């Protein structure tokens, strides 16, 4: 069995660790950056955790490593499980090590192939970078219970370098269900659909959040359906960018159906009825990753790429403007844009190559 290292100690990291432990009998190493060890330290105090899944579960003992070098030593697959905001800092830490015998997996990815190309030392770069559109699970931790609320029937991945069938097989077995391979990491970047529903949903919830209304309705049950017209408009603009760049993707609703199944006939019905999302709380503050990450670090870049290739995205722009007003920050200036990635003035081909980690 290929050794696995997990970087991050949040919901996804612990669910992946519990899944590997209970399904495959494997104990991956877990490391978290010193600057963000709240969950890591909680787990250390708890000791043993319990995976609670729809088909299997049980107790498992996470192997926590304080030292990054120890955590990744001998790992065939190194999983980067932190949100976009935390990826760059970890990549800078990884740049100190020889990764040439490992595959780095961004779960999920967010232009991670590009970030690796710009950050890691070429001589010691990983065999390949794999990016995914999403997590394999809907999940969260409640104290010592790691809840695998839903297991996706598949999820999409792409690699910067061709992988042998043997390596692909060792990668695929790490998940409950096999992933679907896309041709380009650039397609993965535009198929991370968090910026489609999250920003529109939290902006719809703004009055309830800022007025402190209690109890606040559940995020996916109430606020995303309330904003569904905007969600669909953003999704259509996303696919227009994808088409213009010659990449592949699907609608947000198509992904939801493919991942989770169910009988929903449209996006609104899915968000209102999918049990895996039913208890997800609405954020308590507007200063939340649905804006500070999904807008500032992904949607802003979508908008700038759209402008560079001549695609009109008025709904995306309106969300960026509204998020800027809420955060009292001009996200088009402070967010992750083409210039900050050294892609100012780049054409469509150069943008795709960069997102592919070339």
Swiss-Prot record:
Domain of life: Bacteria
Keyword Oxidoreductase: yes
Catalytic reactions on record: D-octopine + NAD(+) + H2O = L-arginine + pyruvate + NADH + H(+); D-lysopine + NADP(+) + H2O = L-lysine + pyruvate + NADPH + H(+)
Top EC class of this enzyme: oxidoreductase
GO molecular function (one): D-octopine dehydrogenase activity
Keywords, ordered alphabetically: Crown gall tumor, NAD, NADP, Oxidoreductase, Plasmid
EC number: 1.5.1.16, 1.5.1.11
A Pfam family matched in the record: Octopine_DH
UniProt cross-references to InterPro entries, sorted A to Z: 6-PGluconate_DH-like_C_sf (IPR008927), 6PGD_dom2 (IPR013328), NAD(P)-bd_dom_sf (IPR036291), Opine/Lysopine_DH (IPR051729), Opine_DH (IPR003421)
Function: Reductive condensation of pyruvate and arginine, lysine, histidine, or octopine to form octopine, lysopine, histopine, or octopinic acid, respectively. NADPH is the preferred cofactor, but NADH can also be used.
Family: Belongs to the lysopine/nopaline/octopine/opine/vitopine dehydrogenases family.
Protein name listed in UniProt: Protein ocs
């Amino acid at each position: 069995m290929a050794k696995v290292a997990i970087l991050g100690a949040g919901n996804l990291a612990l669910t992946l660790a519990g899944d590997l432990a209970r399904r495959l009998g494997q104990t991956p190493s877990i490391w978290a950056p010193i600057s963000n060890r709240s969950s890591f330290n909680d787990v250390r105090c708890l000791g043993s955790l319990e995976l609670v899944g729809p088909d299997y579960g049980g107790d498992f003992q996470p192997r926590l490593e304080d030292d990054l070098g120890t955590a990744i030593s001998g790992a065939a697959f190194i999983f980067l499980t932190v949100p976009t905001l935390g990826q760059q800092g970890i990549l800078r830490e990884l740049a100190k090590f020889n990764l040439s015998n490992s595959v780095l997996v961004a779960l999920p990815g967010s232009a991670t192939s590009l970030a690796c190309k710009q950050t890691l030392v070429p001589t010691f770069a990983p065999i390949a970078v794999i990016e995914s559109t999403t997590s394999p699970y809907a999940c969260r931790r409640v104290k010592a219970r790691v809840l695998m609320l839903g297991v996706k029937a598949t999820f999409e991945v792409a690699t910067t370098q061709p992988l042998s069938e043997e390596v692909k097989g060792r990668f695929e077995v790490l998940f409950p269900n096999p992933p679907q391979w896309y041709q380009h990491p650039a397609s993965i970047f535009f198929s991370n659909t968090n910026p489609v529903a999250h920003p529109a949903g939290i902006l719809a919830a703004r009055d309830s959040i800022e007025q402190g209304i209690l109890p606040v309705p559940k995020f996916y049950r109430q606020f995303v359906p309330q904003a569904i017209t905007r969600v669909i408009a953003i999704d259509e603009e996303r696919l227009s960018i994808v088409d213009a760049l010659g990449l592949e993707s699907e609608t947000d609703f198509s992904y939801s159906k493919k991942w989770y199944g169910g009988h929903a006939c449209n996006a609104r019905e899915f968000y209102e009825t999918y049990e895996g999302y039913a208890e997800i709380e609405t954020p308590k503050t507007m200063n939340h990753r649905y804006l500070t990450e999904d807008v500032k670090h992904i949607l802003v870049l979508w908008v700038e790429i759209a402008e560079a290739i001549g695609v009109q995205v008025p709904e995306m722009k309106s969300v960026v403007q509204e998020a800027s007003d809420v955060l009292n920050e001009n996200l088009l200036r402070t967010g992750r844009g083409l210039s900050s990635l050294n892609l100012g003035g780049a054409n469509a081909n150069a943008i795709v190559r960069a997102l592919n980690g070339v």
